[in-house]
Amino acid sequence: EGGEGKAAAQYVSALVEMAKQEISRDNYGKARELLEKALVYPENLGEGKLEGSKDNNINYYLGVATEAMGDRQAALKYYEAASVGSDEVAGMMYYYDQPADMILYQGLAKYKLGKRAEGNARFYKLIDFGEQHVRDEVRIDYFAVSYPELMIYNEDFTRKNTAHCYYVIGLGNLGLGNMEKAREAFNKTLSLDRSHNNCRLLLNGMDR
């Protein structure tokens, strides 16, 4: 118990990061191969996709790679797929909640579709959530799937929540193009949670 989703998340993250590198090298065909691979979990992971998973990040970068290859119409279909999903920001507790990152990619896809107001609404929603909850005192008095992991590692729930809220603030600012504010928020996240892999990847991407 407590390890659900972690191997699958690392599998997808590794493929998406490799695809982003290929995009930066103008190897768009290779990027697409990697991203299409990320859409399907191999059997040896022993885990299927959660119901409702939208793969916003994968579809967004498929759109970017496809557009760079000159097929704007096909790219628009990927951006449409990347733009769907809930825009409600979840807390940091449960692996089956939609990750906040997916709202960032929804917004970026909205931009690509010419729907800037809808994209901005998602980015501001991320920032508002983070600012409203960053000082929350968090305690758990019930059992859930994520609870065993949290207990084994003796997690400080309030500290973990604070790190998550700064991360969410960073996501919103990154989407809006407020790079310094995003960098500041991501650094605050990492000062509280050095193992926040997604935050580190986004921050490293900003510094390239």
Tell where the protein language model's regions lie, with residue ranges.
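Amphipathic alpha-helical segments of tetratricopeptide repeats
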Residues: E1, E36-E47, A81-G91, I127-D128, ...
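"A position-specific structural signal for the A-helix of alpha-solenoid helical repeats
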Residues: Q10, E17, K54, Y60-Y61, ...
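TPR alpha-solenoid repeat register
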Residues: A7, A14, G48, I58, ...
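Residue-level recognition of tetratricopeptide repeat
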Residues: E4, Y11, L45, D55, ...
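Flexible helix-coil transition and linker loops at the boundaries of alpha-helical arrays
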Residues: E1-A8, P42-G52, E88-Y95, I152-F157
